């Protein structure tokens, strides 16, 4: 506590590493085709790290999306390539259980394991927002690894989603929420969580693809317009969580916050960016954030599960931190930093040992979920650090912000190396030493980099690459 404001109880680097260690060393559970990491088999486990006899319905599609997002932050920040393994496990497991060729949706991944959770994915139902999230994860994984089979699967998923994208209205989203993949029958018509469809179509428009880009652009614009015309106006932010059935009026915080994040990432998509994000933040805080603890706002999940959870608290903090950086609003920054600190108090619970963190779901929710405790929890801290690097521990060296994927990241005392996957881009690195910046053994022109204070934090190196990919930073 400092001046009545909550502070992190564990430095964020340690929390992130210990949490990733839990995923990398995840216990194997028996399935009908052999032992598999628990995150492929169930979504939930006990606060002491044990697994109940009955498996909980799984949400592998969403976990794959957030797992890949986590890797995109974690790898540049720590240089740990092993953090990719849980993502590969999730993507390969989904790809192993594609739907039969004679189904209405052939060759489709199963993004949930609800019918008989056991690690064997045989569900007939798809949720279209999760399909979009899975496709994004496959595209990003293919980009990083160069393995084109993952891109081909992502394009196939995208083609099926494009085929069912149409006009929406107040009771029908542009893509139905839930569809029976065997029959093609629509089971639920409405989900406000359409922003991942927009993100997927954006990705397709920015790459080489065999799909019709005119069709993609038209449908991308249609979905984005629907979001602005309906949930942005009527606040009917329902339809995301896999374990909630037929609940049109069950509002959640997830969809408005992820929509706000999209607007922050894509300012050209919304001329009213500052006000719209502020309105979404105010809506979520007003409906789900009634509890304030020592300056930090604690966020509940949804109307039918009105419980404070750290993943959603950290999600709110990450969007608020980004908005504060955009606008220069000091009060918003202070609230965001306190909210991040509050959300950390469920990490590394009393059953954790050594360098492995068992993370409870929230302060009053001791059980653990792979989504809420790990995959959809940890990435929000990296977004906070990208906005406000003072969250990064002093005396450490970290690449905390990039505009493209990086490879061959390596850290040594007084030395940082990496290769960017695109010839132009910007990286920001917090350093414990005064740097000299090289590319190909030659000093980088001073016009391409600067070192000093950035957003209230000293020791920040900003590199604006033009026509180069390989960077080495050495102590001056």
Predicted regions mapped to residue ranges:
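C-terminal beta-sandwich/jelly-roll accessory domains of carbohydrate-active enzymes
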Residues: 391-476
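Low-complexity, Ser/Thr/Pro/Gly-enriched N-terminal "stalk/linker" regions
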Residues: 1-62, 81-118, 148, 155, ...
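Terminal, non-catalytic domain-edge segments
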Residues: 1-33, 89, 203, 207, ...
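Surface-exposed intrinsically disordered loops and tails
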Residues: 34-56, 101-120, 171-186, 236-246, ...
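Well-ordered alpha-helical segments within folded domains of soluble proteins
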Residues: 1-4, 56-76, 119, 123-143, ...
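Beta-propeller domains
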Residues: 211, 219-236, 249-257, 265
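Alpha-solenoid helical repeat scaffolds
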Residues: 77, 97, 144, 164, ...
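Solenoidal tandem-repeat scaffolds enriched in leucines and small polar residues
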Residues: 142, 147-230
